[in-house]
Amino acid sequence: MDRVVSHGHSVGSSDRPGLLRIEDCLDARGRVVLPPGVNLISLIERNIDNVGDGVAYRYLDHTGSAGVRAVEVTWAQLGTRLRAIGAAIQRVAGTGERVAILAPQGLDYVAGFFAAVKAGTIAVPLFAPELQGHAERLETAFADALPTAVLTTASALGSVEDFLGRLPKARQPAVVVVDEVADSEGDRFTAVEIDVEAVSHLQFTSGSTRPPVGVEVTHRAVGTNLIQMILSIDLLDRNTHGVSWLPLYHDMGLSMIGFPAVYGGHSTLLAPTAFVRRPERWIEALSEESRHGRVVTAAPNFAYEWTAARGKLPPEADVDLTNVVMIIGSEPVSMSAITAFQNEFEPRGLSPNAIKPSYGIAEATLFVSTVAPDVPPTVVHFDRTELTLDRAVLVAADDPGAVPQVACGQIARSQWCIIVDPQSAAELPDGSVGEIWLHGDNVGRGYWGRPEETRHAFTARPSSRLTAG
């Protein structure tokens, strides 16, 4: 492995706060309440002051012919890049204007996202136009967001210019090439006071069931949801790191770069294509981190199926998954995928409790529920006919009409959930099928540019509530 490491220098300050303590984010009743002034940018600044020489993000580049090349950035170096890129953004975009990231997976994407937030603009995490099969989604998101500026890299600039060239001149944004911005640009950066209720970024929905829409995710929602995940998955050990190949424009991928900001650790990133071509790369990266402490990763159901089938390692491979926690979600979870993965990798130290079936939606920033840390994945079976009648009736696994459903655990702390009849808006009793309604500080502010849909989805109130038992 060719390792490229840049060395930064941390500068401590006695009047600056230390690393965030999770207990400082809980009130007297144990509810998640962000302390004043806490947001992604202030957390990054804490890390710069306290662990500036520590690695913040590592990217495993598999595009070269000589094997994997690891590129790292420390917290101090990241801070330098954020000021420089932020200054470049401030020259072309004002506070509250949208800045779209159209860049390939990598550290420049990470820096671009955080720089847009630091500059006081609204980040719009998208992807380079060269990504195949997503042209319509990009065009829809771009038309909705109407960004003032675009962040990209030198390698993707050609495809970005081609894409922007097809837009009407009145809609063509300024372009900032992130990896060509000199560090010295940071001298021109103007600090911005971040309002916790302001929009941090627009998270576009997947578009799997409807055209993609941009969820307005506030700074409070981001911070709250990260704390909720840390508490639910029991990631309280500071010696916890992340590994992810998920696209950074995906809400689950974006969360994987948020974790390190909270606890001062680091995340190791891969490109989605690197995983798809050789899924064992994911396992190898997890194993490397597992040797040094706890490691958390997240992926959709198909990834576990794909890795169990195509990510097999030779018996002599030195792989240790003892300290790995794996979130599975983002699409319907199947017990067959979990079982296949467990059978393949439990001999490598994977705990029976390691895989955490979870549920989340972009409207809730990401995370809604997961199973308890000490609980293995479980499945229940419902009667197919009864489900069509909006009734959840348990049956035996061998019942001819049995429909398996993997349990996604408990609702996160300081998030409230009820099941509602969508027609009457009345809360339903146990055993009923209805809409999931959520409430909490992690819920987004609305859909960007869609006031009617926002009123329908984000301001609805139940017409009647069940009596608490």
Predicted regions and their residues:
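Conserved AMP-binding/adenylate-forming
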Residues: V324, V333-G469
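Conserved AMP-binding/adenylation subdomain of ANL enzymes
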Residues: G223-H241, H250-V295, R310
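Adenylate-forming
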Residues: T152-S159, D179, A274, R291-N343, ...
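N-lobe entry segment of adenylate-forming
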Residues: M1-V73, Q77-Q90
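Conserved AMP-binding/adenylate-forming core of the ANL superfamily
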Residues: D53-V110, F114, L131-E139, A191-E193, ...
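Short hydrophobic alpha-helices that are characteristic scaffold elements of the AMP-binding
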Residues: F114-P125, D144, H250, A261-Y263
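Structural core segment of the AMP-binding/adenylate-forming
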Residues: D2-S6, R91, A119-E185, G293, ...
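Conserved pre-ATP/AMP-binding loop-to-beta segment of ANL
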Residues: G52-V55, V176-V177, D183-F204, R210-P211, ...
